[in-house]
Amino acid sequence: EAVQAVARAIRRTRAGLKDPKRPAGTFIFAGPSGVGKTELSKALAEFLFGDDDALITVDMGEYHDSYQVSRLFGSAPGYVGYEEGGQLTEKVRRRPFSVVLFDEIEKAHERVYDSLMQVLDEGRMTDGQGREVDFRNTVIIFTSNIGTQDISKPVGMGFQDSKNANESNYQRMQNKVREGMKKHFRPEFLNRIDDVIVFRQLTEDEILPVSYTHLRAHETRED
């Protein structure tokens, strides 16, 4: 479902059906750790821009206090760090064709959302040095663990085959994620997101080929 949802949004962009002033795509990838949110983001960067280095990752846990927000977008004149520029805006300015991954967005201070609203609305942002940074060619992805804390708990009673149990767990997780997001994020933020994608937990049959792929990649690097 995640791959299909992203593919639909990218096709709309390439067909010219999106607002040209906004980023190429904006998504929330929700789900517990280890379900492939970051891996899909890397694959998307490589597919769209030919290089997985086109993925710009921002750990939002580093911006949970108000005084840290200026590091992301650049300090105002006269403040410490003014000459360095923002850690996000500088990277996007140098690489405007990229996937920008805001990891665990729920950990960020509310001032981050205020600043990002301009990006989601207008596809641009003015950094601390007064330079306009263009986000219109970026795909923006927010990851979140909201609502996934207790999804491993079994649901239902009696006999239930694994397929039905997995589907029941997934539906329960979707509901919890969407309820949690409505409580945590402001409506004006959620309304500017193209799609909220809830990742399924990986089954054993899915984990094995993923592990094999990572081992092969490690062997290739060693060679």
Give names to the regions the model predicted.
Residues E1-R216, R221:
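AAA+ P-loop NTPase nucleotide-binding core of proteostasis motors
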